């Protein structure tokens, strides 16, 4: 922050003679005025709290008129409290309220900015049920029922200042529940601060049902959107909801070496279909990027009939005519010049409102795709290694602006992967590079690469290894090898699926993941934040239907598989929090980064702090092969490695496939075993499996 230091120094020089012998209050007053002129402010100027409440103060500075950004480059001793018995603050602006009273939380840089904190007595306003397991087995005793309800519900107290916290209710009334009769019954929770307080109550309904149906799906309360907001590496992501996207095709001075001038409209029309078609079975032969993510974001699966969380509205622009050959961009990222010129051209020539392309108002443009008029470097065989398919973040030298959004995560792709031997010459006009792109069996246009890259724009990583020959994730997932649907982890972190999280032994029936998005998570103890950024075993029933169907039948690339079977994943997505220096599961704890990835043995980011974590994969699809090792470099993930009827699983049985041999990476035993009792076909055409889940002490 040299600009600030310079301004601070000049201010001292300017007032040096005048301030000699002056009071500190005068100096503070002048410094405060300087701070005001520099546009420094806190996120809150006053706050009413109750004892035990925590909140974070942020510092903002106005860069230019009307545009602000968070300021984090301050000294550890910048924060202070005028009364630490009332409230304390750490060196990152995290405030904890302790007792009734008032104080100021001060931030001192150029002048002092304050937040006045008033701590009042806890006055209970109401309670609410934020999580309640709905189904319980017939024949359970009322005492057992009360104990299970207490362990499987979250009660939140709401105070007069609207602060909320999870509490343990003193009373759970199940007197109206007939545990020996099927039906739905009310359960009342009551809570008070002290015995003299008026009790506040809330009522929820539970169902007495068969033992095999006693688990409810749980929604993840944390998502990739929380992580992206807190991450030191990720910004400008796509969101759930409706957003606009644009593809800008780029014509270089040498593009006519690769595309006939007369075929330019073919490229634009085909890109419109590959990315945004509403009728992809006719236009493509599979899915467009639009329909793929709109279907995959149906929380309860493709057969649910519900609307997906993702709603994409997109178009392809005219060609942006560049004044350079494609070779200019072969060795460096083109975004600093070419991309910005293309974006400026698009909005100036179309007259569209740039703010319409920032659906979440984060100051970054949503879904900008640059389709360059050249084949990728692996096809040409030269050193043009930037002419590849990737999604890259915005330039960190740029500052986001809500009034005029800038480029966020954006896609850089060639036109050529849309085609194969069956249509390359017809659509492009030239045939020089057709062999690289295969036959596109069963497809009119090929969307696979573009769907994969769109996954990156939703903050999904590549799940293949770039450092070893091993194939930990498996060949047939979208973020691993451009195949079929996504893995359970990708669904959970985007809130595109809910999960069964049992905490006791049970028999559970699940449907195949494409039809239902049924996922089972096994863990010694699930985290309080209900965050998917944890370590656990995930179960899903794979079937060759839904988004898996096309690749199962046509063998794109490695191909998907045509048989039904249980897939068992070891997922370790714990976070490192830079603000606390600790491992956490909650991205809201501060600035975080995921500890693991699938490029094992090559530590980066937070892995450099915990060097031993570079051996822990983020996603690992387990083989049904007790002799298979996590370090095995065989790439032959086969259908025989799926868990079929009669198969069993425990960490002790498959210890070779875990770095810590029989334990999770966190050092804990899983204490769960799984038996696949049966796999069957449902009347609606979906598939099902009966799982026996046994929890040991």
Give names to the regions the model predicted.
Residues 373-557:
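Extracellular hydrolytic enzyme modules, especially secreted metalloproteases
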Residues 211-450, 461-468, 571-697:
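Propeptide-to-catalytic entry region of secreted or membrane-anchored zinc metalloproteases
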Residues 554-566:
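Short coil-to-beta strand junction motifs in C2/discoidin
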Residues 64, 123, 242, 252-259, ...:
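Primarily extracytoplasmic ectodomains and periplasmic/lumenal surface modules that are beta-strand-rich
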Residues 94, 242, 472-474, 532-534, ...:
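Short, solvent-exposed loop/turn segments at the edges of secondary structure
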Residues 1-12:
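Bacterial N-terminal signal peptides that target proteins for export
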Residues 25-212:
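Extracytoplasmic soluble-region selector
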């Amino acid at each position: 922050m040299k600009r600030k230091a310079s301004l601070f120094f000049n201010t001292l020089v300017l007032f040096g003679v005048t301030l000699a012998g002056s009071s500190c209050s005068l100096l503070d007053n002048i410094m405060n005025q300087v701070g005001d002129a520099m546009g420094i402010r806190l996120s809150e100027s006053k706050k009413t709290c109750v004892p035990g409440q925590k909140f974070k103060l942020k510092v903002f500075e106005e860069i230019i008129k009307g545009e602000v950004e968070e300021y984090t480059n301050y000294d550890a001793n910048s924060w202070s409290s005028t009364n630490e018995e009332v409230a304390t603050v750490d060196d990152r602006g995290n405030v904890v309220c302790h007792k009734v009273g008032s104080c100021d939380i001060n931030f001192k840089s150029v002048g002092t900015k304050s937040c006045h904190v008033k701590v009042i007595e806890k006055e209970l306003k109401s309670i609410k049920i934020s999580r309640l397991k709905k189904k319980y087995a017939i024949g359970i005793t009322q005492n057992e029922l009360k104990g299970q309800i207490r362990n499987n519900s979250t009660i939140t107290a709401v105070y007069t200042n609207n602060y909320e916290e999870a509490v343990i209710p003193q009373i759970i009334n199940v007197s109206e529940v007939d545990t020996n009769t099927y039906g739905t019954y009310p359960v009342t929770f009551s809570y008070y601060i002290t015995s003299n307080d008026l009790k506040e109550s809330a009522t929820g309904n539970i169902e007495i049902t068969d033992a095999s149906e006693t688990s409810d799906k749980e929604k993840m309360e944390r998502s990739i959107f929380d992580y992206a907001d807190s991450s030191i590496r990720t910004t400008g992501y796509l969101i759930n909801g409706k957003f606009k996207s644009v593809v800008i095709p780029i014509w270089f001075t040498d593009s006519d070496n690769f595309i006939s001038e007369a075929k330019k409209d073919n490229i634009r029309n085909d890109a419109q279909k590959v990315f945004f078609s509403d009728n992809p079975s006719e236009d493509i032969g599979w899915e467009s990027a639009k329909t793929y993510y709109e279907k995959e974001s149906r929380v309860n699966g493709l057969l649910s009939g519900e609307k997906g969380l993702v709603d994409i509205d997109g178009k392809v622009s005219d060609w942006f005519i560049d004044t350079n050959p494609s070779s200019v961009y072969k060795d460096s990222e083109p975004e600093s010049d070419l991309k910005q010129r293309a974006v400026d051209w698009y909005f100036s020539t179309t007259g569209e409102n740039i703010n319409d392309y920032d659906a979440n108002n984060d100051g970054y443009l949503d879904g900008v795709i640059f389709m360059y008029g050249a084949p990728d470097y692996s096809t040409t065989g030269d050193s043009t290694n930037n002419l590849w398919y990737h999604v890259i973040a915005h330039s960190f030298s740029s500052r986001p602006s809500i009034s005029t959004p800038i480029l966020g995560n954006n896609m850089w792709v060639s036109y050529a992967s849309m085609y194969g031997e069956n249509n390359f010459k017809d659509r492009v006009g030239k045939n020089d590079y057709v062999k690289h792109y295969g036959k596109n069996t069963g497809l009119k246009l090929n969307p696979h690469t573009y769907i994969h890259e769109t996954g990156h724009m939703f903050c999904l990583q590549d799940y293949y290894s770039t450092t070893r020959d091993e194939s930990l994730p498996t060949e047939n997932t979208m973020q691993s090898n451009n195949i079929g649907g996504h893995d359970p982890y990708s669904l959970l972190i985007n809130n595109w699926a809910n999960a069964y999280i049992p905490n006791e032994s049970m028999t559970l029936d699940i449907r195949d993941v494409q039809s239902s998005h049924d996922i089972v998570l096994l863990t010694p103890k699930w985290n309080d934040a209900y965050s998917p950024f944890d370590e656990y075993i995930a179960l899903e029933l794979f079937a060759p239907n839904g988004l898996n169907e096309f690749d199962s039948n046509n063998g794109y690339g490695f191909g998907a598989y045509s048989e039904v079977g249980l897939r068992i994943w070891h997922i370790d997505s714990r976070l490192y929090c830079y603000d606390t220096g600790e491992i956490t599961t909650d991205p809201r704890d501060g600035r975080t980064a995921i500890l693991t990835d699938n490029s094992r043995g090559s530590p980066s980011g937070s892995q450099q702090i915990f060097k031993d974590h570079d051996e822990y994969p983020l996603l690992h699809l387990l083989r049904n092969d007790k002799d298979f090792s996590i370090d095995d470099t065989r790439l032959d993930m086969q259908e025989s490695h799926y868990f079929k009827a009669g198969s069993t699983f425990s960490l002790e049985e498959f210890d070779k496939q875990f770095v810590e041999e029989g334990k999770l990476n966190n050092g804990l035993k899983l204490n769960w075993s799984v038996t696949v009792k049966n796999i069957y076909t449902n009347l609606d055409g979906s598939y099902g499996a009966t799982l026996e889940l046994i929890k040991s002490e």
